From Swiss-Prot:
GO biological process: proteolysis; symbiont-mediated suppression of host innate immune response; transport of virus in host, cell to cell; viral translational frameshifting
Domain notes: The N-terminus of helper component proteinase is involved in interaction with stylets. The central part is involved in interaction with virions and the C-terminus is involved in cell-to cell movement of the virus.
Name recorded for this polypeptide: P3N-PIPO polyprotein
Source species taxonomy: Viruses, Riboviria, Orthornavirae, Pisuviricota, Stelpaviricetes
Domain Peptidase S30: 176-317
Site annotation Cleavage: residues: Y317, T318, G774, G775
Alphabetical UniProt keywords: Host cell junction, Host-virus interaction, Hydrolase, Inhibition of host innate immune response by virus, Protease, Serine protease, Suppressor of RNA silencing, Transport, Viral immunoevasion, Viral movement protein
EC number: 3.4.21.-, 3.4.22.45
Length: 999
């Protein structure tokens, strides 16, 4: 059998039956060929390297295919310009980080991306040139791109940007409250009581279980004291039960401070003292652990817890009667002490004198024989009020001699007077009985009121508050009745005054003529609209809706403001908000007074009065809704809306502040003939408005309207815009198309130009014709400033004397102002100017001149001010008879009225001993006015000195030609004499002249 060797291992090979002979070329032997089976062959194991190679080739082919696809995709994308543009922007956009740590790409515009890319390329080029050594050894303009600091040994942390330290959890330790027993609380309370000495009460269950105690300092010790029954006058066999209060007594003794004490030392006043066995004598006198002092019986100490048969044999150790009395008196006396402390009290009287004073007051108000007697007290209690007063009066009469002795004590006389006055009766019965006789058997209301007042007066000091209240009410009712029936004033006329608004609208023919209306029924302005530009361009300002309406809401005037409803042009579509827009803002509503009416020849001029309701109350204005481009006219009935001239159809106009009265002239333009519209508008612009200016009075406006109606009579029937009257600021508001958000004003009755002209009459009596847009206080201050600034300006003062002479009356604010006006001879010029015009105005100047002469003779400011106050009444009487159509009439009249009332009030204050604060205010005001005068004088002197220097220079120039220039002494004397005559001063050197040099 054949074998095969595998190393050292031999493997047999079986012989195959069918042998195949194989001839070898060089071998003579015949070889047997055997058949090799599969089981004899080794298993084929493929190489791992080949597997990897196959996988690698597959992957390479896949990557090549993917790259080829990407390359083809890139070629396709490069052809898309929009996508390349977005890619370019994304490559050059910066990366930002949010607060939370998240990153995002901030997208740029294409232009910004190009700039950023160009900057990047430039930096790359500079870096390449720098690395290649292209830069030479010299300075270059630029900035360092990196940090110059060298970092040395520094700590490197491995914390990521997202690291956040976890806070250590706070361990909550639950604190358990310690339970405190009642014994601990009681110890703390008693510790405080022992320190302060305040009394403490132990409340027990049942009768006689309450215990009152207090810590007292006796014999240098702190000992608890129990309040016993016999201290209040009640004597019992056993004062208290020991076994009921044993625990309480232990706590009381626990906080007491005991020491060595002899039992014989105990005496009166020691009743209720509590001792325990720490005190030596306790064991000898009682078998109990505690001893409460009650008193002594046959020389032996008695405990309050012991039962005794005969309580009357015990000597109780209560306080002495005088000590008890003083203790009670002291407690109430300190509680009723006055609460005001104006000084530190001292001991100026001994105890005996103090006792006499206390007894005197006590027996005066509460006369008894013994204060401790219950019958004496009940006797006073049972007396009626009248009997008690009689009893007090009788007692005072019996003790009159003693009162005479005690009157020397300070303050006691006032007490005596008070008691006598409080108990005295009204002894003057004759007058009271006469009143009763006259009013007897009369049942009218006024007679009954007089009887009630008489009854209260008859009672005198015994009248109660109810009696006085009833008498005061009856007196008030009588006063009102008398006021309503007075005939000395015209106040009663207002009770029946009615000025109702007409229910029918006025008819304006110009608005009804078909020739002046278009096919829509609107008024056609024609030439009037073209010429109306003279109004809108000069005295109106354009309202730009795009800028909002807020700045036009507040309509200011010198003494207040009014709110327009222009903001309501923005209409909300919400129904609730739209209803809110219909509500106005009310001002303080004024009642009907004499200021609301105007009279002529004693009769009411109704168009010049305020409108009233049916019951006589004033008619208050309501919300006036705004419109965009209209002229609103008509004071009665529904308003009429006239379109503004259509020259600028898309523009809105509002009158400038101070020129709202131009709406009246614009309404008159409706009735002006077209061929006369140019003359009308030019006359208003060039003549009327310069005369009226801003904030004119209603009287001036009516006069200007009258002048225009003379040239254009057809305007008399023109309807007026609604005019609201503000009595608080003495202002009249002419309402335009923007309405009024402020409500509560009075309404003027005048509806046409013809009715408005009545305000121009001098015979018209009433305040409203002097109303203007502006207040009295502001107007007065303006007049004062104008007066002070004009004292040293003759031309300006002449204008004031001609146009507004009442302004000089305001010089009463300061004696210095009056003296300067007197020295400048302004009063004399006023007399010369008005002597042929109005004698009543001349009286004012003469009185002011006479007053100034008296003031100049006195140097004391307070006396000068008193002289001025005394003449205020006389000036007020004169000015009431003067013409009332002058600008400052109202302000000056009110100023004089204030002066008069202040003088009367100060007189009453001085009579009653009060201090007048206006004295110090007068000094301050005088200083301020003198400062203003000095400033004005300095300006005037400067101008005067310039002219004087020019004159002196000319004189010296002439003297220089006549005399030798070398004679300096003579020239100096000449210069000095001229300065004395012209400048009222004597200079040492002629420094004011620069023409000649005298050095």
């Amino acid at each position: 059998m054949a074998t095969i060797m595998f190393g050292s291992i031999a493997a047999e090979i079986p012989v195959i039956k069918e042998a195949i002979m194989i001839a070898m070329p060089k071998s003579k032997h015949t070889l047997h060929v055997v058949q090799v089976e599969a089981k004899h062959m080794a298993t084929e194991i493929r190489s791992e390297r080949g597997k990897l190679y196959v996988a690698k080739r597959f992957a390479d082919n896949a990557i090549k295919a993917y790259d080829s696809q990407l390359k083809a995709f890139d070629e396709l994308l490069k052809k898309n310009s929009d996508l390349q543009k977005r890619l370019f922007i994304g490559q050059n956009s910066p990366i930002k980080q949010k607060k939370g740590g998240a990153c995002f790409v901030r997208s740029l515009s294409f232009k910004q991306a190009e700039e950023r890319h160009a900057k990047y390329l430039k930096l790359q080029e500079e870096e390449h040139q720098f690395l290649s050594g292209a830069y030479g050894d010299k300075a270059y303009v630029g900035s360092v791109q990196g940090t110059l600091d060298r970092k040395v040994a520094e700590k490197v942390s491995f914390k990521s940007p997202y690291y956040k330290r976890t806070c250590k959890a706070v361990r909550q330790v639950k604190v358990l409250k310690k339970a405190v027993g009642s014994g601990k609380v009681l110890d703390q309370v008693l510790e405080i009581v022992a320190e302060t000495g305040v009394p403490v009460t132990f409340v027990g269950k049942g009768a006689n279980k309450t215990l009152r105690a207090q810590y007292v300092r006796r014999y240098g010790l702190v000992i608890p004291k129990i309040f016993l029954c016999h201290e209040s006058g009640r004597k019992v066999h056993r004062e208290m039960s020991y076994w009921h209060h044993k625990e309480t007594l232990q706590y009381l003794c626990k906080h007491g401070k005991y020491g060595a004490l002899n039992e014989n030392a105990l005496c009166k006043g020691d009743s209720g003292l509590l001792f325990d066995q720490r005190t030596a004598f306790v064991k000898r006198v009682t078998y109990l652990p505690h001893f409460i002092v009650r008193g002594r019986q046959e020389g032996q100490l008695v405990c309050a817890t012991e039962y005794l048969d005969n309580v009357y044999t015990i000597e109780h150790y209560t306080h002495k009667p005088e000590e008890q009395f003083f203790k009670g008196w002291k407690q109430v006396f300190d509680k009723m002490a006055p609460h005001t402390f104006e000084h530190d009290c001292t001991i100026d009287y001994n105890n005996e004198q103090c006792g006499e004073l206390a007894a005197t007051i006590c027996q005066t108000l509460f006369p008894v024989r013994k204060l401790s007697c219950n019958k004496c007290r009940h006797r006073i209690k049972d007396l009626s009020w009248e009997e008690f007063k009689q009893f007090i009066l009788a007692h005072l009469g019996c003790c009159a001699k003693l009162w005479e002795e005690q009157k020397n004590l300070p303050g006691l006389e006032k007490i005596h007077s008070f008691v006598v006055q409080a108990t005295s009766e009204n002894m003057i019965f004759e007058t009271s009985m006469e009143i009763v006789r006259l009013t007897q058997n009369y049942t009218s209301t006024h007679m009954l009121q007089i009887q009630d007042i008489n009854k209260a007066l008859m009672k005198g000091s015994s009248a109660t508050q109810e009696d006085l209240k009833k008498a005061s009410e009856q007196l008030l009712a009588m006063t009102r009745w008398w006021k309503n029936h007075m005939t000395l004033t015209n106040e009663d006329a207002l009770k029946t005054f009615r000025n109702k608004r007409s229910s029918k609208a006025l008819i304006n023919p110009s608005l009804l003529c078909d020739n002046q209306l278009d096919r829509n029924g609107n008024f056609v302005w024609g030439e009037r609209g073209r010429h109306s530009k003279r109004f809108f361009e000069n005295f109106f300002e354009e309202v730009v809706p795009s800028e909002g309406y807020k700045k036009y809401v507040i309509r200011n005037n010198p003494n207040g403001f009014r709110k327009l409803a222009i903001d309501s042009l923005i209409v909300p579509m919400d129904l609730a908000r739209a209803r809110i827009a219909l509500q106005g803002e009310s001002i303080k509503r004024e009642d009907l007074t004499l200021a609301c009416v105007s009279k002529q020849d004693g009769n009411f001029v109704y168009p010049c009065c305020c409108v009233t309701q049916d019951d006589g109350r004033p008619f208050y204005s309501e919300l006036k809704s705004p419109t965009k481009r209209h002229l609103v006219v008509g004071t009665s009935g529904d308003p009429k809306y006239i379109d503004l001239p259509a020259t600028d159809s898309d523009r809105m106009y509002i009158a400038k502040e101070g020129y709202c009265y131009l709406n009246i002239f614009l309404a008159m333009l409706v009735n002006v003939n077209e061929d006369e519209a140019k003359d009308f508008t030019k006359m208003v612009r060039d003549v009327v408005v310069p005369k009226l200016g801003t904030w004119p009075s209603m009287m001036d406006v009516a006069t200007a309207v009258y002048i225009m109606t003379v040239f254009h009579p057809e305007t008399r029937s023109a309807e007026l815009p609604r005019i609201l009257v503000d009595h608080a600021s003495q202002t009249m508001h002419v309402i335009d198309s923007f309405g009024s958000l402020s409500v509560g004003y009075h309404v003027l009755k005048a509806g046409t130009v013809n009715q408005l002209i009545q305000f121009a009459s001098n015979d018209l009596e009433g305040e409203m014709k002097h109303y203007r847009v502006g207040g009295d206080a502001e107007q007065r201050m303006r007049c004062e400033r104008a007066l002070i600034s004009s004292i040293f300006k003759p031309k300006k003062m002449m204008q004031i004397l001609e146009n507004d002479p009442y302004t000089l009356v305001l010089g009463l604010v300061s004696p210095t102002v009056l003296i300067h006006m007197f020295r400048m001879k302004h009063f004399e010029k006023g007399v010369e100017l008005w002597i042929n015009k109005d004698q009543s105005v001349v009286k004012i100047f003469l009185l002011l001149e006479h007053l100034t002469r008296k003031i100049a003779m006195n140097d004391v400011l307070l006396e000068q001010l008193e002289m001025i106050s005394q003449q205020a009444g006389r000036l007020h009487e004169i000015i009431c008879d003067c013409p009332k159509n002058i600008h400052s009439y109202r302000a000056v009249k009110d100023f004089l009225e204030v002066k008069m009332e202040a003088a009367l009030t100060n007189k009453e204050l001085a009579n009653n001993g009060f201090f007048d604060i206006n004295e110090s205010l007068g000094h301050v005001s005088e200083k301020n006015l003198c400062k203003s005068l000095r400033e004005g004088m300095a300006r005037a002197k400067l101008v005067g000195k310039i002219f004087c220097n020019m004159a002196i220079e000319k004189v010296l120039k002439g003297y220089g030609r006549a005399f030798d220039k070398e004679s300096c002494r003579r020239q100096k004397r000449i210069f000095k004499k001229i300065c004395e005559c012209v400048l009222h001063e004597c200079p040492n050197t002629p420094r004011k002249c620069t023409y000649y040099n005298f050095k």
